[in-house]
Amino acid sequence: MLPATLGLRQNLRQFILLVIVNAFVGGMIGLERSILPLIAEQEFHLAATSAVLSFIVVFGIVKAITNYFTGTLANRFGRRKLLITGWIIAIPVPFLLMSADQWTWIVVANILLGLNQGLAWSATVVMKIDLVGERQRGFAMGLNEFAGYLAVALVAFLTGYIASHYGIRPYPFYI
């Protein structure tokens, strides 16, 4: 077996794929940030501030705990398996958000989303660093964050636009 070749140019295809995957991870957050406060107020009659705090706090705690274990899990089971597991966990999230008839289901969706983010986002970070090596680690991290947060902004804008024209459920979730 040949030794792995490090560097962005040498691994550009895999790197671009991981940037795209990370953008999808960020897109899930963008969808939530624009739509859930509206759902909280209009459908569940919750104050937007309370609602935002409840789902963001739950998401943040779960993501932080998952991040803590992700490095060890990645070394034990492999980065690819972690990334796939993170996405499998995320599959029900849009469906839960689209059909939730109680705020509890929104919170449950955010627990799953926190697990997804902790596994998938973190796995893409580690995988990118593995591909480019230590010398280009900062650049890899910068692209990772740029792609993720650009997707947050674009999807938040797009879902907000869709919600303002077609309603807050279900159309924004089809993205």
Predicted regions and their residues:
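Helix-to-loop junctions at the C-terminal end of transmembrane segments
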Residues: 66-78, 163
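Cytoplasmic helix-loop-helix junction between adjacent transmembrane helices
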Residues: 111-148
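Short hydrophobic/alpha-helical segments at membrane-entry points of transmembrane helices
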Residues: 18, 104-110
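C-terminal ends and interior cores of transmembrane alpha-helices
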Residues: 88-101
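Helix-loop boundary and gating motifs at the non-cytosolic
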Residues: 9-60
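Residue-level signature of mid-helix packing/kink "hotspots" within the transmembrane helices
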Residues: 60-68, 153
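A membrane-interface helix-boundary motif in multi-pass transporters
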Residues: 164-175
